Swiss-Prot record:
Protein name per the record: D-alanine--D-alanine ligase
Entry binding sites for ATP: 173-228
Similarity comment text for this entry: Belongs to the D-alanine--D-alanine ligase family.
Example GO molecular function: metal ion binding
Cofactor(s) this protein requires: Mg(2+); Mn(2+)
GO cellular component terms given for this protein: cytosol
Organism: Caldicellulosiruptor bescii (strain ATCC BAA-1888 / DSM 6725 / KCTC 15123 / Z-1320)
Cited InterPro entries: ATP-grasp (IPR011761), ATP_grasp_subdomain_1 (IPR013815), D-Ala_lig_Van_CS (IPR000291), D_ala_D_ala (IPR005905), Dala_Dala_lig_C (IPR011095), Dala_Dala_lig_N (IPR011127), PreATP-grasp_dom_sf (IPR016185)
Residues noted as binding Mg(2+) 2 in the record, renumbered to the chain: E313, N315
Keyword Protease: no
Enzyme kind, highest EC tier: ligase
Amino acid sequence: MTKLKVAVLFGGVSTEHEISIVSAKSIMQNMDKEKYEVIPIGITKEGKWLLYTGKIEDLDSKWTQFSIECFVSPDRTKKALVKVKDNEATFIDIDVVFPVLHGLNGEDGTVQGLLELSGIPYVGCGVLSSAICMDKAFAKKLALLEGIPQGHFLVVYKNEYSAKKDYFIRRIESEFSYPVFVKPANSGSSVGISKAKDREDLVLAIHEAFLYDTKILIEQAINAREIECAVLGNDEVFVSEPGEIIPSREFYSYEAKYIDNSSELIIPARLPKEVTEEIKDLAGRIYKIFECCGMARVDFFVDKDTNKVYFNEVNTIPGFTSISMYPKLMEFSGIPYSQLIDKLISLAIEKNRQKKSIKYSKEG
């Protein structure tokens, strides 16, 4: 049987560079080597593309020591990786690309745009849905237009805030009650997110969030449980049972997710049946509204007192580490890790096949 050549992208110019490496390593270790020839492609924090030549089990933060310069050709007649060694370029054919790039410059439609130009099938959401889901402000606005329940929010731009700080502080305090969450609009893994309990906290939180983006979100804090759903599919969508995060800290921060490792995942979430069904229905609706394909994780809040469900965000390239919710939810729902990878790759090929039927010329 001819093996599919699957290029796995990891690293990237992102605050989630290290997490991406862990996710990609986990995916590559769980790929069926009888079906796939794995081609690991790393992107450094400076944006350099490199073909990783070391062993998958040895992949860590020092991966660049075992690498050769490369890049994906945007020429769709090639559908290949270009390897550059000793000033000579050679083409390596690629059947599918599996982007495992969390956050900016990977999960936001930028790499997806390059892969669209190349014509190579790729796992996950397309350019538009990736960009919208990455930008929490646009995602919130679209959800609002579609009548999806969510908490009160305000979008603040850095240049406007710098010119009228006092105005925005007063506006926030008039529209919200403490505590509030302050988030960079384009960030993942809770990087740059703070919970503000008073004005002093708020000023510091805004400063912190603006370190990671020029646009931030102010959100009303809700006394809520953090619930997540894994969604899989293109035209036909499968929604997993919901899972719950019990944060080891006050909220599911970057540290709680990846450093102290003591947050608890409860699968399935212990919810009333009608709340579970509402969450699954909303997850499927949101997936379709945002025109997602391949995969996404849809996150919600559930009020601890009333069980009211609120939309939080969509992650188009969810974590695939050993402690990540997405593969755990899918496994609980009957799709083991290796089968999940198979399905994602087949969905990528299916999506690419559909695009090939589109006419780009009036001729013929």
